[in-house]
């Protein structure tokens, strides 16, 4: 899987689980992508910022 597909899959993972509390989401994201919860927290924040940027500028990820 290339990096573009990975980012798309991670964003899809987050969008599908929008009803989870942040603690559970961070735990499941960390397990799914093989990272620590602290790393997951940082990646989730970065993906959220990327998604907002893309929406504001009409860019498709």
At which residue positions do the language-model features occur?
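N-terminal acidic leader/helix
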Residues: 1-31, 52-56
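Short, charged early-sequence alpha-helical segments and their helix-coil boundaries
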Residues: 37-61
């Amino acid at each position: 899987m290339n990096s573009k597909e990975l980012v798309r899959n991670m964003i899809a993972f987050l969008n599908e689980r929008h009803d989870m509390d942040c603690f559970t989401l961070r735990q499941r994201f960390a397990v799914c992508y093989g990272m620590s919860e602290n790393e997951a927290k940082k990646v989730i924040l970065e993906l959220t910022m990327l998604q907002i940027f893309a929406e504001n500028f009409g860019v498709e990820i």
